[in-house]
Design a protein with these regions (language model features):
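Hydrophobic aliphatic residue packing
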Residues: 16-24, 85, 102, 235
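Secretory targeting signatures
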Residues: 1-55, 370
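Ligand-binding clamshell of periplasmic/extracellular solute-binding protein-like
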Residues: 89-101, 105-129, 135-137, 143-144, ...
Length: 370
């Protein structure tokens, strides 16, 4: 082969080698880029999943008055659906008992109570955040079941009380309460020192005595002397005995009766602790607890986030959700939403609550004492 031909073939071979190197390098770069991007995506997804898991691995802990636990469960579900923030099933009990547990340092995020004093420093001690919100009102009723109507004395009492509701005269209501306290029927009552519905049942009897018998202690003393009262730790503990006929009536909140699909006697606004029109009349009556005197007043639902809330930011989101959505979500249970909700505070409230005040959803209403 001649020298010029050899040089020509060499240059051709070199060019081919360079092309092969470029192609291989390009394929390698593409492969690295593709797999690197995929790995990066997988890592990002893993980190996002890890972050999501860390956010949801510790659900909010709601302490709820046991008479409100069905509604509380509904609020939790709606909140989680709206925000993605997880919540544990409500821990329920009497409001005063729950306040005592919170004061002892038990883990809690948010507290819903049916007693104002339970959300103040008098019961929460150092766990009081200094603020609480009243977001709905309730009233007392006497629940009864189908088993109640199998008892002739109870059946007659239901008829008399329904007639009193229609007539709405002092004499007809006197007949109703006289039959209720005769001892021929049993009335269940939650422990007043643990469950506010308990002392409120006694306050209703005092108000009724004054309104219909001109003696505030008349029906109260009559029920006690006739052994007509049955007490348990809470009203919730007496629902099963009511349904089986062991007791014929139960002092309970209207919302709880509705939530548990119980029949109930509608009591007049003058005595049911549910009408702001009669708030001054309610305040004339009281009940002595182990921790002090409880005065009659309109029944309200309260919400607060204790000082050592397990997650203050998410807890405040739940509080805001309840304030904003109570009118829609709670009305079907017989509760009357408070609009705007009433804020009671003895300290500066968090910015989120200040925003609700600015939006007209919260109304400053005084110090959080009681």
């Amino acid at each position: 082969m001649s020298a010029p031909a050899s040089k020509k073939n060499f240059r051709l071979l070199a060019a081919v080698v360079i092309v092969i190197i470029v192609v291989v390098a390009g394929v390698g770069a593409y492969y690295y880029s593709s797999t690197g991007s995929s790995s990066s995506t997988v890592m990002s997804s893993t980190m996002a999943s890890s972050t999501m898991m860390s956010q949801t691995s510790t659900p909010l802990i709601l302490y709820s008055a046991d008479s409100f636990v069905i509604e509380a469960t509904m609020l939790e579900s709606a909140f989680t659906s709206s925000t993605g923030i997880m919540m544990a099933p409500p821990k329920s009990g009497g409001s005063l008992l729950l306040a005592s547990e919170i004061a002892q340092g038990n883990p809690v995020s948010v507290f819903i109570s049916l007693s104002h004093s339970a959300v103040t420093a008098s019961n929460l001690k150092n766990e009081s955040s200094g603020w609480a919100i009243a977001f709905a009102s309730d009233q007392m009723t006497l629940a009864y079941s189908n088993a109640t109507l199998q008892n002739s004395a109870a059946n007659a009492t239901v008829a008399a009380c329904n007639s009193a509701l229609a007539a709405d005269t002092n004499s007809s209501w006197n007949t109703c309460f006289t039959m209720l306290t005769s001892g021929s029927v049993k009335i269940g009552t939650g422990n007043p020192n643990a469950d506010p519905s308990g002392y409120r049942g006694w306050i209703v009897l005092e108000a009724a005595g004054q309104a219909f018998a001109n003696d505030s202690s008349f029906y109260e003393n009559r029920l006690i002397s006739n052994n007509g009262n049955v007490t348990a730790a809470s009203a919730a503990d007496l629902i099963a005995p009511l349904q089986t006929g062991q007791i014929q009536f139960l002092w309970i909140y209207k919302s709880s009766a509705v939530a548990h699909k119980l029949n109930y006697l509608q009591l007049p606004g003058r005595v049911n602790l549910g009408s702001s029109k009669y708030s001054s009349f309610y305040s004339k009556f009281s009940y002595q607890l182990a921790t002090g005197v409880q005065t009659g007043g309109v029944i309200r639902l309260w919400i607060t986030a204790p000082t050592d809330s397990t997650d203050t930011a998410d807890s405040l989101q739940f509080v805001a959700f309840v304030v904003k959505n109570a009118p829609t979500l709670l009305s079907p249970y017989g509760l009357v939403p408070t609009t705007p909700a009433k804020l009671y505070n003895s300290t500066t409230v968090p910015p989120l609550l200040q925003q609700l005040v600015s939006e007209g959803l919260l109304q400053p209403s005084g110090p959080n004492t009681g």
